[in-house]
Amino acid sequence: MGSVRSDGCDLYYEEVGEGAPILLIHPSGATASTWGSATEELARIGRVISYDRRGYARSGGEPVRSVSTHTTDAAAILEHLRTPPAVVVGTSAGATMAIDLAVRRPDLVQVVIAHESPWRFTRHLPTVPQVAALAKIGSLALRGRHGDAAEALLRSAYSYRDGGTAWDAFPEEWRRAARRNARAALADFLITIGNYPSSADLATVEVPVVCTHGSRSPNFMFRVTRSLASAIPAARMHRIEGAGHAAPFDATTNFVQLIADTIHLLTP
């Protein structure tokens, strides 16, 4: 573990394993410590680097208002560690940041694995449960109940198409972490559901990108992922069996195997 200075913030990071660098960019309401057993399993195939994004936990700082700031931070970590081009893995908001790293700093990226980025989420017709959840989130946030608002957001985001939500199955410490980092989680949602990176930016991406979606995710998540993949020339789609939005938790083995297979395909 250690820290990297990036634009006034000391970013906390952890690393384990040896081999191909695998940078994990966590989703909203998470930290370097909420990847569960996926970290240990990935360490068998590469050098796993995880970190608390700016605004979260041990990195501290105010909630971030632009994806590009997170992208700059991710680049700073890879540059500090002097890694060769990395396998950059992100889920949800972290997936948007992983893709933006391929846009801004392709020299640092070997391949991106992006699970269910909410890119252009606002352009898709919301479901009735989503409308209700968004109304609740907004009401709670306006009343200053940020922890409750973040819980409502993540409970909805991690819902399964067949009922229930991964949120209820998460370890209690993960849920506490989400509530403690509520303002950062809510900021993540706002900055990643729009049109960033732009379609023009995505069209410039030349490194391979794997856009994944879960077999247990609501149908709209497939449409969001398909829209993103179609905007990136070097992208392909992949369905992770048994997974919802929380793929590293829902289907750890399948999530790790996808990363291992991707690394194998890129190895000369």
Please tell me what each predicted stretch does.
Residues 2-61, 77:
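Conserved HGGG/HGGXW glycine-rich cap/lid loop of the alpha/beta-hydrolase fold
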Residues 163, 172-198:
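Hydrophobic, aromatic-rich cap/lid helix
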Residues 240-256:
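Catalytic histidine-centered segment of alpha/beta-hydrolase-like enzymes
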